[in-house]
């Protein structure tokens, strides 16, 4: 018995050593550093902004996509970013990997960077309320979008620009993670149970097992989208925090309905107005909850719904707030017999049916909101491992509906209808069975409290897997009863329904949406890499559009003058 145990440990150590070598490829990414707050020179509290101002672009939401979008547009134009949340400097725990759990534990006082809500499904959830958005409160996982995702969007992407844009993001806020024991153990187990091939270190969404990028550096410092503001022109950028945008201002004439500005309030309740000049635009980057909410409050939505709420209809858009999705998260928690070090997610197991990862954590006495399905879930009194399954897509979808027609600070009612689509449920069953194999692997044997076969022998925190690994009905019940949010909700302002392929709101001039509300599926196992890229990408595309338009205008007005001058000169020459 002792000999076989020692052999297993030696084999495990060899696996870990080989895995570590495979993950040691060199990649040019960001260098470990302190979080760079240089951008604070052009950040203001909304209380200190003018009551009325005019800009080339107004961006509603300084989050994952909004910050790189603003930085890019500021190269040529004046940009105002209106962020409803606070500065990350107010909450230092945001800036550390240890703070991920702490920030979920912090009570929501209406100002804290993690805003709590409970979906119509009864599932605890959170959203970012801070400059940097969810990139400032998430688990730091960085992945490029699945190649097939681009093909499914209905958009003709400039893939050369996409890749250059990823590089622009990655050389500032993305890092190659150092060795973490639990993450390497997780990778070993994934390979053992057939999540192949071993892809080493890669930022690409690839089927198999790999080490991926992180927005936490190897000192545990968080880097987020706010730092991309440093790449902008400080003379053209103005960011206002604690700025709650209440409505979009529209004008209407023979050319149609046009967004010309926004109304926002500061923390004292004072009303401000900001307008766009000339060919400028209002761009919503308020996320899958905030962007549909603001459109509805501004009179853009299903006509009968808006009328029933006594909201004046500006434009009939039946799909605003429809088709919002959230990837279900199911999991198993194990309590090892001996303490394990805490780790952040850096190793991923990817298949076509499910995405998997694991974290190890210290014990806690206060429940992190949304981490477990509900407040009654048992809490760990020792270190534990959280082994997670994510359903890709998904196909199940729900709605965003207003709870207040006058106050944007009142969160809308969001329902996701988890597992209402049978394909999603089948993917959960498949994934949780694979987690059963994961628990049965040789790599996990040292973490049992009893030497029992298969999935037995673990000290399980919370709901255990069904004992019969072939009982699909029992697994379906498990999936439904133990579901939590992966915090990767998306949709509500879909391209092809609400937006055209340039992210413009159809039927309205000078209004776009650039954020996580725009697509019906998650772009990769973890979406933040795509939306960081999207902000920069769309900023570049808009600059290109403006340049082409201005060159055409210049040509059309300049050439006739040249011809007129030439004609006069020729006439004078012939006459003389």
Curated annotation (Swiss-Prot):
The enzyme's E.C. designation: 4.1.2.10
Entry function: Involved in cyanogenesis, the release of HCN from injured tissues. Catalyzes the stereospecific addition of HCN to a variety of aldehydes in vitro. It is a major seed constituent, and could have the additional role of a storage form for reduced nitrogen.
Encoding gene (name): MDL2
InterPro entries hit by this protein: FAD/NAD-bd_sf, GMC_Oxidoreductase-Related, GMC_OxRdtase, GMC_OxRdtase_N, GMC_OxRtase_C
Name recorded for this polypeptide: (R)-mandelonitrile lyase 2
Family named by the database record: Belongs to the GMC oxidoreductase family.
Catalytic activity: (R)-mandelonitrile = benzaldehyde + hydrogen cyanide
A Pfam family that the UniProt record links to this protein: GMC_oxred_N
S-S bridge residues: 428-479
Organism: Prunus serotina
Taxonomic lineage from the root: Eukaryota, Viridiplantae, Streptophyta, Embryophyta, Tracheophyta
């Amino acid at each position: 018995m002792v000999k076989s145990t020692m052999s297993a440990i030696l084999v495990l150590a060899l696996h870990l050593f080989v895995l570590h070598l495979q993950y040691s490829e060199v990649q040019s990414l960001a260098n470990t550093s302190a979080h760079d707050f240089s951008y604070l020179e052009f950040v203001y509290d909304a209380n200190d902004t003018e009551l009325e101002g005019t800009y080339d672009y107004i961006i509603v939401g300084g989050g994952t996509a909004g910050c790189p979008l603003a930085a890019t547009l500021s190269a040529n134009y004046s940009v105002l970013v209106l962020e409803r949340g606070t500065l990350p400097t107010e909450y230092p725990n945001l800036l550390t990997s240890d703070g991920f759990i702490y920030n979920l534990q912090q009570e929501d006082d209406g100002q804290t960077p993690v805003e709590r809500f409970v979906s119509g499904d009864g599932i605890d959830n959170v959203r970012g309320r801070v400059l940097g958005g969810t990139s400032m409160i998430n688990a730091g996982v960085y992945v490029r979008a699945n190649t097939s995702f681009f093909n499914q969007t209905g958009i003709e992407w400039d893939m050369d620009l996409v890749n250059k844009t990823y590089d622009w993001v990655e050389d500032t806020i993305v890092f190659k993670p150092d060795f973490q024991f639990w993450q390497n153990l997780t990778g070993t187990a994934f390979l053992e149970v057939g999540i192949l091939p071993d892809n080493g270190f890669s930022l690409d969404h690839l089927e198999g097992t790999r080490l991926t990028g992180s927005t936490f550096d190897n000192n545990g410092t968080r880097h987020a989208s706010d730092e991309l503001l440093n790449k902008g022109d400080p003379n053209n950028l103005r960011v206002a925090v604690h700025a709650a945008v209440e409505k979009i201002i529209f004008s209407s004439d023979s050319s149609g309905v046009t967004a010309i500005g926004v109304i926002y309030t500061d923390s004292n309740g004072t009303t401000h107005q900001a307008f766009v000049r000339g060919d400028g635009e209002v761009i919503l980057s308020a996320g899958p909850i905030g962007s549909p909410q603001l459109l509805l409050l501004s009179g853009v939505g299903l006509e009968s719904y808006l009328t029933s709420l006594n909201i004046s209809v500006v434009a009939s858009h039946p799909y605003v707030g429809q088709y919002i999705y959230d990837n279900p998260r199911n999991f198993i928690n194990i309590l090892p017999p001996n303490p394990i070090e805490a780790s952040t997610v850096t190793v991923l197991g990817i298949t076509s049916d499910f995405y998997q990862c694991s974290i190890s954590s210290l014990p806690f006495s206060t429940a992190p909101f949304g981490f477990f399905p509900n407040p009654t879930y048992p809490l760990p009194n020792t270190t534990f491992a959280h082994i997670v399954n994510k359903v890709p897509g998904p196909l199940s979808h729900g709605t965003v509906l207003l709870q207040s027609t006058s106050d944007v600070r009142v969160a809308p009612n969001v329902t996701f209808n988890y597992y209402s689509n049978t394909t999603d449920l089948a993917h959960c069953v498949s994934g949780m069975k694979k987690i059963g194999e994961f628990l049965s692997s040789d790599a996990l044997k040292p973490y049992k409290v009893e030497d029992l076969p298969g999935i037995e022998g673990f000290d399980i925190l919370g709901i255990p897997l069904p004992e019969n690994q072939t009982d699909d009905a029992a697994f379906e019940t498990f999936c439904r009863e133990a579901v939590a949010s992966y915090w990767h909700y998306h949709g509500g302002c879909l391209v092809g329904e609400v937006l055209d392929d340039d992210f413009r709101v159809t039927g309205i001039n000078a209004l776009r949406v650039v954020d996580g509300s725009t697509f019906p599926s998650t772009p990769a196992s973890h979406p933040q890499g795509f939306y960081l890229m999207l902000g920069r990408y769309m900023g570049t595309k808009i600059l290109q559009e403006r340049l082409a338009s201005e060159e055409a205008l210049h040509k059309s007005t300049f050439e006739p003058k040249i011809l007129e001058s030439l004609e006069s000169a020729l006439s004078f020459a012939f006459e003389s």
